[in-house]
Amino acid sequence: MRISAKTDYALRAAIELASLGTSDPVKGEAIATAQGIPLRFLENILGDLRNAGVVESRRGVEGGYLLARPANEITLADVIRAVDGPLANVAGTRPNLLEYHGSTEKLREIWVGVRAALRSVLEETTLADMAEKKLPKHIEKMVADRDAWEVRI
């Protein structure tokens, strides 16, 4: 699975906002500096997050960005969908809509299973979890397995 820079930056920006735990708007420049994200790229990402209802923006001298909902109500999946669309698709098609025939007919179930696995991690982890540096128990168990860290080519 490839994770785009846009997704990585969006998650880092949203987690940064959650970790600050403030109801005061945070300047885009402050988020960009704290996370080492190019400001121009971040501004577009924050626009996508705003359009999806993940963040709010305030104008003016005291303006900036803040989470639109409590951090414990925003999942990593919410952020990813806001900037990159569905968690899993095959050539732009959602797995459940694919049709395979003959020897490949079970491939659809594989792609649906991949999507379910992504959901089990990304829909079960909130920005609050990340800001508090904790993971859901089932994810802790997954990453505790040394095999999870093995690089395979």
Regions found by a protein language model. Give the residues of each.
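Conserved segment of winged-helix/HTH DNA-binding domains
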Residues: 71-96, 108, 112-116
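Short amphipathic alpha-helical interface segments
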Residues: 10-22
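Beta-hairpin "wing" of winged helix-turn-helix
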Residues: 53-67
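Key DNA-contact positions within bacterial/archaeal DNA-binding proteins
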Residues: 40
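A short alpha-helical element within helix-turn-helix/winged-helix DNA-binding domains
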Residues: 26-36
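Alpha-helical residues within the helix-turn-helix
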Residues: 33, 50-51
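C-terminal regulatory/oligomerization modules of transcriptional regulators
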Residues: 95-153
